[in-house]
Amino acid sequence: LIYSETGTLNMMDLAARLPEVADQRTTHTGFAFIMIGFALKLALFPLHLWLPNAYTYAPSAITVFLAATATKVAVYVMLRVLFTVFPQDFVSATPTDELFILSGMAGILITSVIAAYPANVKRLLAYSSVAQIGYMVLGIGLASATGVTASLVHLFSHALMKGARFMAV
């Protein structure tokens, strides 16, 4: 949809051409689909259901790699798209920040409670990862330099620590 409006998928070209078509319904729909895709890849609550099973049933060596990289790459790419491709007035005109804050807070609270009960350690760490992703998205949803910086610091520390925890399992 974004390609049909702009004629390109290059991030720099999109950043230059999107202000001209920011008011189009197609652009808003494309933006929504992109954000939903990122939410799925991030395992953002409530679109997180694939992550606990993937971490639990994958071989331990694969789980270490998945836990350290898969969702973190999605956070980084989402940040790039939000802050370099789409114009800031476009993003602020959508309910993206509010949805990130709500889903981040819900993910933190609900998956932290769920993580307290599983008997399988890998499943516990998977639900803990969903909660940590909630913290990262909450920082992004604040739409401030401090929030984004905190999210990036948390992203790197979570990648290192969660990978190490899965190595220990």
Spans of model-derived segments:
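Hydrophobic transmembrane alpha-helices and their helix-loop junctions in integral membrane proteins
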Residues: 1-169
